[in-house]
Amino acid sequence: MSRYLTQLDDELCWFPDPSHALEEPNGLLAIGGDLSPARLLAAYHKGIFPWNEPHQPTLWWSPDPRGVIRPDQLHVGRTLQKIIRRTPFDISVNRAFNEVITACAAPRRTADGTWISQPMIEAYQQLHLLGHAHSIEIWQEGELQAGLYGLSIGRLFCGESMFSRIDNGAKIAMVALCRHFARHRGALIDCQMQNPFLATLGIEEWPRARFLAELARLGHQPLLASCWQEGEISL
């Protein structure tokens, strides 16, 4: 299979097959195009996602292997279980999407900048208004302390980013997502790439072909209707 980088046309909402993605950098498939809801949804339904530095044009990726978590097999170690039991917090769904994505876009202490630009924020806010993008929020004493956001495609959730202002807040948010998603027939969480944080939670690396086959299968299967209704949830 030939591998090449495709320049996208702003007028055409189209992507090449992910099998053409470059091996180095791993998964880079296309460049350019807008961040319209139609293009973003077309990308995610083909296992493609945008990621680029703010000074770069939009870059589209489909890495091989793909990092995934099966929500019913999430690894919650003893230490994290104790933290969850002993830490007072409230959890909600879709109560503060804009605040979550804004917090995810804020510069981190461990990084020089952020990849979530203002156009990216506005694009996912639009997807949220259309019912495709969702958030999980962790609260303490009425203050938003951690959260994550992503897209739901049938029984698959495409995680995008997370943040935390408290110790282990991001892990608690991931546990909340997995348990809530599994209770509503969710079957797979796309984490895009392996990293040390996700390794502690049981991330698996699947060949891209396996991930795309599962995406095609799960993307047309419905969740329980109440999954993304705004409100509080419990672990």
Each model region followed by its residue ranges:
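N-acyltransferase acceptor-side catalytic subdomain
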Residues: M1-L235
